[in-house]
Structure formats: structure tokens, C-alpha cells
């Protein structure tokens, strides 16, 4: 028997993480395209991972409501999603927190260290955009970390459901 509240909450959090990641990296891809620079492989990888996560959540919810949600497929799918999320998390953390020239280094050096700015100008709009991009990177990193933890949690919850079902029939 699946714990309803925990499963619902974890699936909701996983869906939100997937949706935010898809939106974030789609926006990054759009910006890279407009800047006419190459698009890193992990942008597409994380868009695909977020999309697979949302599909997983929708399928799990449908199977739960028709009483066909089995623990073993959930454990396997959650583990695979964990590997995908962890791969994206490692690559994003290298880009965000890596050595000199990383995203965070550039944000601190060129965006946050500047003096006062404001007023009605194109420069103000550019600064708002720059801060938004810096914050979006940190948000994407946080969502990837949360999705990794939630995937493991769902995997362990499925394992507990499977163990409880075995004990009941032994």
C-alpha cells in the first residue's frame, strides 16, 4: 500500500522540478541561439530529463488512480531518473561553481559587484536581465538537487512498499 500523502507530495515536487528545469534550460537554449554561440550538450540533456520526469509523474499518477501502480517499475524508473538528475547536477555544478570563469564567478565579478544602477534606460534593463540569468542558474541548480533527492526518496519508498507486500504474503 502506497503512502498517499507522501507519494502525492513527492510526485508534485518532482513534477515542479522537472517543469522548472525544462523551462530554464529551454530559455538558456533560446538565449544561446540569439547570441549565436554553441549550445552545450547538457542543456538538451536536462530538457530531456525534465520532460521524462514530467512524463513519469503523469504516468505514476494515472497508474495510481486506476490501482495499477506497482513498486518495482517505480523503483527502477526512479533510480534511472536519479542517475539522469545526478549527471545533470554534476555538470551544472561544474559550470556554476567551477574554477575562474564559471557562471557564479562572472556573476559576482560583473553583475553583483557593480555599484548602484537604476532609472529608465537600456542599461537598467540589461542589468535586470543579467541578474535574472544569474538567479536562474542558481534556481536550476537547486531544482536539480531537489529532484535528485526526491528521486532517491521515491525509490526508497517503492522499496518499502515492495518489502511490506512481501511480508504480507509470506
Question: What are these model-predicted stretches?
Answer:
Residues 99, 123-126:
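Secretory-pathway extracellular proteins and peptide precursors enriched for disulfide-bonded cysteines
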Amino acid at each position: 500500500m502506497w503512502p498517499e500523502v507522501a507519494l502525492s507530495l513527492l510526485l508534485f515536487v518532482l513534477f515542479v522540478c522537472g517543469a522548472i528545469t525544462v523551462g530554464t534550460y529551454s530559455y538558456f537554449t533560446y538565449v544561446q541561439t540569439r547570441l549565436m554561440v554553441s549550445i552545450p550538450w547538457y542543456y538538451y540533456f536536462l530538457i530531456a530529463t525534465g520532460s521524462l520526469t514530467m512524463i513519469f509523474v503523469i504516468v505514476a499518477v494515472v497508474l495510481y488512480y486506476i490501482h495499477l501502480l506497482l513498486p518495482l517499475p517505480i523503483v527502477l524508473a526512479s533510480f534511472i531518473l536519479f542517475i539522469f538528475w545526478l549527471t545533470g547536477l554534476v555538470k551544472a555544478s561544474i559550470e556554476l561553481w567551477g574554477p575562474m570563469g564559471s557562471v557564479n564567478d562572472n556573476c559576482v565579478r560583473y553583475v553583483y559587484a557593480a555599484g548602484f544602477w537604476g532609472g529608465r534606460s537600456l542599461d537598467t534593463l540589461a542589468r535586470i536581465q543579467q541578474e535574472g540569468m544569474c538567479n536562474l542558474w542558481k534556481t536550476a541548480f537547486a531544482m536539480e538537487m531537489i529532484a535528485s533527492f526526491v528521486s532517491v526518496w521515491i525509490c526508497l519508498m517503492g522499496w518499502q512498499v515492495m518489502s511490506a507486500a512481501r511480508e504480507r504474503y509470506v
